[in-house]
From Swiss-Prot:
NCBIfam families: myo_inos_iolC_N (TIGR04382). This is 5-dehydro-2-deoxygluconokinase. Catalyzes the phosphorylation of 5-dehydro-2-deoxy-D-gluconate (2-deoxy-5-keto-D-gluconate or DKG) to 6-phospho-5-dehydro-2-deoxy-D-gluconate (DKGP). It is an enzyme of class 2 (transferase). The lineage of its organism: Bacteria, Bacillati, Mycoplasmatota, Mycoplasmoidales, Metamycoplasmataceae. InterPro entries: DKG_kinase_firmi (IPR022841), Myo_inos_IolC (IPR030830), Myo_inos_IolC-like_sf (IPR023314), PfkB_Carbo_kinase (IPR050306), PfkB_dom (IPR011611), Ribokinase-like (IPR029056). PANTHER family: 5-DEHYDRO-2-DEOXYGLUCONOKINASE, HEXOKINASE FAMILY MEMBER. The gene is iolC. Keywords: ATP-binding, Kinase, Nucleotide-binding, Transferase. Its EC number is 2.7.1.92. It catalyses: 5-dehydro-2-deoxy-D-gluconate + ATP = 6-phospho-5-dehydro-2-deoxy-D-gluconate + ADP + H(+).
Amino acid sequence: MKKEFDFILIGRITIDFNPMDYYNNLENSSLFKKYIGGSAANIAIGLSRLKNKVGFFGSVSDDQFGNFVLNVFEKEKIDISHIKKTKDHKLGLTFTEMLSEEKSTILMYRDNVADLQIDVSDIDLDYILRTKILVISGTSLAKSPSREAVLKALFLAKNNGIKVVFDIDYRPYSWKNLDEVSLYYQIVAQNSDLIIGSYEEIQLTSRFCLENPENLIDDDYAKYWLKFVDLIIIKNGKKGSKLYQKDKKLVAKVVPVKMLKGYGGGDAYASLFLDHYLKNESDLENGLALATSAASIMVQSHSSFDLPDYQKILEFKDNALKSDPDLVQKKEWNAFKK
């Protein structure tokens, strides 16, 4: 069966306000630029710009900001047929504080937000069957009714042979407590095909299934999660990232750049890697090099979604490899060898 979509995403859509007078305290900033935000939204835009057919399960406010999101998505050629409008909820707002190249913070307004109002009745099996891959963003598990909608989408995809990617995307301000986070993350992770998360996010996901997870290293987590998934990526900020499969381990460094801000690389990383994973799964070394290159490009950018075209990323990656041929290294590994 020919698939209409390469990816369908489900997750967070927000409005970001980033200061133009940056390297300043937020209380002293007076000029901001508005962007679409939220990890799932940013990844969707990134994937679409990489010439993938992209759909989205979501919910936005029935007002000017909701219209702004839908207009951006349509401009970016993302299908909006399964993004509903809600009159009683507003989109989350994020104000960024860029204090220095190294330090950035955010001020978020996420009470009763629109993106968490997607309901089980909004999840359409026919829509899921039209995609090759379903991408779930972990923030969408934070509250009902979105939580149940995500679980429905997960099991419909799994039971119909659709690959599931879990981008953990932990945001503490959306959750009641850590037990709730770990419980729902574990359910989704154990039913996914691919997991992407930071070391801290993987640790949080593992609290109920591994003893003393705070004392474990990346390899330990990989050995456990590869019992369930085909591939896991563990990110460690400036230390780089690691990709694991049952018989493969790749270690990627970060490409050093002069940063504008200390965030925004993760969504570009996911976009480039997932694009390459779909189109050329046999060459994951190159996919990881592209992903880490895209992340370095984005921390130099003012927004989190303004991904440059593929050719610029390719040139950046090629130059990075010339400077450091060991940007991505293959390590000896077998997850289940005793």
